């Protein structure tokens, strides 16, 4: 039992009979073991520095898979990267009150909180600007006219009076003083928009065909699939705090592409021809491991996914990444590096174990040729 728990039990010793004392001592030991399992401050296993206590309880709750992944590196004698330590010490979604206190004091965040607040879409931009940038989430890049007008009003009220369009069909506002950060976040939600998980080690804004629903050549309208994935992420805390950022894009097979092969997961609409083992019709071809700006394009896995199963398959892929992505080296923590280390087949085997069924494969000759399209025919 730790010094703290022994002291606590001793302090109470005059108030309880021997049986109650034994119970309290056991209880306090259990508390310490539980804190060690979570890497909590004041526990015997400090975050990022030591393995779990022998016999410590398994982590539970929505963050359990992330804690187990971190524990595996610690038990191998490795050190977690600083962002992993920050997440382990205090989960960003448990720190909203701290963000509010900083806003009241117009206080700039220190390094750990600067990382944590990115889970809310806030990036402190020092030394270039002594202010935050706030990035939204706009699935498939589509918002209502009154929401766009509302963002303009918020930029005038809480930011620098302007917003930038991002490469993921998104909007972000700059020059947000710390005192205005919380007011801006809550006003964004009043508009029916959000910024949750738009930065740091999270699944970023989902992209879809820019002309979805009006492209005369599209095989499928990507909007409902991007929207489903968007709300799936928002409502599952276990999908936050990945080893590194994660991008998903849906391409509808039209004249205007979404550049899905620059994403960690690319769902590319294809038409399967008759005469093969796969049911003919429109499917998503599954691409994995792209990284924007690295000249690493997502690889065709040979797998095809029914559109209505896209969210389920993407969820399984993300959970395998959560369990096996690198938590020690930020430069090697993207999905691509798991694929490089394992190979696609081993990775897909793990995904299929998560799903509980095999994913269909379609040979290249089963896929109908795509009509002419222009990969540069987009803005951003």
Predicted regions and their residues:
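Short, tandemly repeated low-complexity microdomains enriched for cysteine and small residues
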Residues: 36-41
């Amino acid at each position: 039992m730790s010094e703290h728990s022994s002291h606590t039990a001793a302090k109470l010793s005059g108030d309880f009979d021997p049986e109650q004392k034994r119970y309290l001592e056991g209880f306090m030991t259990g508390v310490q073991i539980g804190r060690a399992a979570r890497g909590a401050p004041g526990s015997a296993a400090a975050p990022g520095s030591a393995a779990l206590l022998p016999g410590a309880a398994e982590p539970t709750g929505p963050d359990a898979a992330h804690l187990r992944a971190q524990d595996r590196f610690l038990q191998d004698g490795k050190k977690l990267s600083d962002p992993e330590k920050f997440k382990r010490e205090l989960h960003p979604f448990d720190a909203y009150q701290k963000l509010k206190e900083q806003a009241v004091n117009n206080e700039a965040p220190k390094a750990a909180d600067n990382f944590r607040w990115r889970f809310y879409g806030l990036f402190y931009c020092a030394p270039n600007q002594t202010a935050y940038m706030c990035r939204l989430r706009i699935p498939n890049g589509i918002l209502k006219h009154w929401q766009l007008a509302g963002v303009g009003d918020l930029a005038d009220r809480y930011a620098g009076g302007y917003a930038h369009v991002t490469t993921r069909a998104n909007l972000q506002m700059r020059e947000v003083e710390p005192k205005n950060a919380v007011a801006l976040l809550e006003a964004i939600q009043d508009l029916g928009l959000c910024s949750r998980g738009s930065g740091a080690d999270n699944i970023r804004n989902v992209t879809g065909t820019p002309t979805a629903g009006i492209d005369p050549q599209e095989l499928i309208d990507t909007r409902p699939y991007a929207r489903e994935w968007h709300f799936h992420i928002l409502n599952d805390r276990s999908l936050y705090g990945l080893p590194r950022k994660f991008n998903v894009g849906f391409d509808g097979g039209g004249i205007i592409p979404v550049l899905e092969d620059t994403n960690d997961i690319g769902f590319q609409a294809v038409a399967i021809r008759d005469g093969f083992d796969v049911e003919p019709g429109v499917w998503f071809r599954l691409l994995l491991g792209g990284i924007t700006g690295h000249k690493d394009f997502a690889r065709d896995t040979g797998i095809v996914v029914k559109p209505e199963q896209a969210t389920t398959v993407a969820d399984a892929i993300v959970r395998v990444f959560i369990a096996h992505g690198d938590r020690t080296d930020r430069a090697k923590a993207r999905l691509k590096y798991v694929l490089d280390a394992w190979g696609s087949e081993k990775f897909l085997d793990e995904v299929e174990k998560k799903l509980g069924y095999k994913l269909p494969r379609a040979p290249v000759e089963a896929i109908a040729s795509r009509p002419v399209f222009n990969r540069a025919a987009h803005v951003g």
